Amino acid sequence: MKKQFLEKAVFTVAATAATVVLGNKMADADTYTLQEGDSFFSVAQRYHMDAYELASMNGKDITSLILPGQTLTVNGSAAPDNQAAAPTDTTQATTETNDANANTYPVGQCTWGVKAVATWAGDWWGNGGDWASSASAQGYTVGNTPAVGSIMCWTDGGYGHVAYVTAVGEDGKVQVLESNYKDQQWVDNYRGWFDPNNSGTPGSVSYIYPN
């Protein structure tokens, strides 16, 4: 099945002040083969790493698409299978991203997550359920066909939800980056491939396309 992928989304992250000694890190480097459901955040948590550093070590950024079977270079010790990995400090990273993009939405919310990736999104579009109408009022095209780089909106008459489309399959299934999915308040690909019209997220689905 042919699929359309977004190889790299524009995602600005504030530069860290610390100097990383790559030589020492590569000397201790190991590899990890990605499993179904893995993400930069889950692998980084497993190896007590920072997700943004992990992506950079592998020549990618945090929004790059990774798939089961691919190998990532890692460092650090993996947590035992019967022991939960120590949480990484994602709060600092997401806060820096918010500052870098002048993100006007509450940190951790779905609107914040999409604005962090799709910086062209409006600053004051309201809750996720308001985004389609707000974008249309500002001259953006809103439609019913998924497209890589578009913003997916679930409008349910309440808060709604939004996500950023990174891949579209010929069967209509999509992959997205989103925040606040099942209360997980950082940007990630939580669902893999899914049918946007049968996703378990309530509301009618529409898409905002960048101008």
Swiss-Prot record:
Keywords: Hydrolase, Signal. PROSITE patterns: CHAP (PS50911), LYSM (PS51782). It is an enzyme of class 3 (hydrolase). GO terms for molecular function: hydrolase activity. The keyword Signal applies. Residues 85-209 form the Peptidase C51 domain. CDD domains: LysM (cd00118). Residues 78-101 have a biased composition (Low complexity). This is Putative hydrolase SMU_367. It comes from Streptococcus mutans serotype c (strain ATCC 700610 / UA159).
